Amino acid sequence: MKVFKIPEATIMRLSIYSRYLRQLIEEGVETVSSGEIAAGVGVSSAQVRKDLAYFGEFGTRGVGYKVEDLYGCLLKILGLDRRWNIIIIGAGKLGSAFALYQGFLDRGFTISAIMDVDEKIIGSELDGVKIEPLELLQQRVTEKNITVGVITVPAPAAQDVTDLLVASGVKAILNFSPRVLKVPNDVILRNVDLSVNLELLSFYLALNNR
């Protein structure tokens, strides 16, 4: 997996900052301070300045940041100034919910292909995208210039699906299965295990009651 010098937590906060700036643009706000951004997203102003400093100098001391300019810079940093084509493997409840979420398009992500092995649902559509058999994976990745794969299959099938995605040329994978996956060094892998997030909540709840 690729290792980045910039902390992952910083990248996640940049995404939150960009969403907040988008909200300010919609409200007609033209300038904003680091303190106002901090108050809006729930971090310290020092943290905002530190996160932005990884990527250069923004804004004017004593004036703040031009909202639209900073928003545009953050989109570019996050790679959201271009379109990314996605393939979803697994069109069950989780895969279907992912495919139907409208927020991805606004952030630069297009669901370009959906695949499954269940003949009962192959041929049906999710938000205008036809569910196709897994055998077409390589063809669709090439045709549609797909760079991101989303895995929402049962754990036993997850590694096999990962191997197929890697072999087809997909360079980034979002894994919703609980399986620990292996990928080559040039493939970016992110795991999203919902149970882990619930366990994190349970830890803090228990900690507060000790």
From Swiss-Prot:
HAMAP family per the UniProt record, alphabetical? Rex (MF_01131)
Q: What does this protein do?
A: Modulates transcription in response to changes in cellular NADH/NAD(+) redox state.
Q: Where in the cell is it found?
A: Cytoplasm
Which positions in this protein are listed as binding NAD(+)? 90-95
Q: Name one GO molecular function term.
A: DNA-binding transcription factor activity
- Protein name (Swiss-Prot/TrEMBL): Redox-sensing transcriptional repressor Rex
Which GO biological process annotations does it have?
A: negative regulation of DNA-templated transcription; response to redox state
GO cellular component annotations, sorted alphabetically? Answer: cytoplasm
Q: What is the lineage of its organism?
A: Bacteria, Bacillati, Bacillota, Clostridia, Eubacteriales
* Family statement: Belongs to the transcriptional regulatory Rex family.
Q: Does the keyword Mitochondrion apply?
A: no
Q: Which SUPFAM superfamilies match?
A: NAD(P)-binding Rossmann-fold domains, Winged helix' DNA-binding domain
Name the InterPro entries for this protein: CoA-bd, NAD(P)-bd_dom_sf, Rex_DNA-bd_C_dom, Tscrpt_rep_Rex, WH-like_DNA-bd_sf, WH_DNA-bd_sf
Q: How does it assemble?
A: Homodimer.
NCBIfam families hit by this protein:
PRK05472.1-3 (NF003989), PRK05472.2-1 (NF003992), PRK05472.2-2 (NF003993), PRK05472.2-3 (NF003994), PRK05472.2-4 (NF003995), PRK05472.2-5 (NF003996)
Reading the lineage from the top rank, the first entry is Bacteria
Its predominant location is cytoplasm
Q: Which UniProt keywords apply?
A: Cytoplasm, DNA-binding, NAD, Repressor, Transcription, Transcription regulation
Name the DNA-binding stretches. 16-55
